[in-house]
Amino acid sequence: MLQRIGHRYLILIALAAVVAVLPLIFPSSYYFRVASLVWVSAFAAIGLNVLMGQAGQVSLGHAGFFGIGAYAVAIGPAHFGVPPWAAIIIGCALSCVLAYLVGRPILKLKGHYLAIATLGFGVLVALVITTESRWTGGPDGMPVAKLVLFGWRVSGSDTWYWITGGLLVLGTWLALNLNDTPTGRAFRALHDSEVAARVAGIDVARFKLQAFVIAAAYASIAGSALALMNGFINPDQAGFLHSVEMVTMVVLGGLGSVVGSIVGAAVLITLPQILTVFQEYEHLLLGFIIIVSMIFMRDGIVPTLSRLLAKRTQA
């Protein structure tokens, strides 16, 4: 137990150190912007990892919750005069309620049936956002009001770097603590075998729903943060391709690994920036690198590297 607690705080200290040191190495607004995008994406991926990596449930429509959070901070101030900080809370609450209502029937499904059902939810959210142009701006998107906290207008890539970095550290801390709670252990039991979990007295339906709601909350908050940071939002953030990106981050980094979700997000966000020098071959190389990574690191980047490091240490 003490070893797990020490490992948990070691991860948090290492993450906080990375967030603190990066501006000293890359002190420019461009790198602040890219890093902020990594932090937001990693935050969303950590939530999805709770659902997929810990509870063993598939979601191909999770960008729907991301879009709800994003559009909440756009629609709230623009149409109802709600302060952006309150719109974040409203968007998160709405996402959690929807996750509960949608999750009750669809989480009775398994495997590819569940994947298709969650995909349908994501498509429905994206469709509503695109067609309800009076509220959302339609396919063209809409501007997002600036976040104001205690009379301070939040702006600038460096400011958002620290806000999103702090958000990621907080989200990581919550996810790591969840692992050692009865809820976290129930999630892992579900992942291993629903039948065995049910025999052990675990309320399978309730814990599936809890994982779905937690993942929705993470995605919604991440969506709100990205919308406020960009000052603009469009339906792509709630689309299927974004859902696939989120799943790829979790799987690439390592299912069940909180650190893996962060690494997966960092790789998937920064690689396209690095590969831009190859111009028209950029997407080809990106796909090739991901395929090779999954062939040689089937469990994901972090679990594979951890296993190799453990073998070397034992030797």
Residue ranges of model-derived segments:
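Transmembrane alpha-helices and adjacent helix-loop boundaries
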Residues: M1-A315
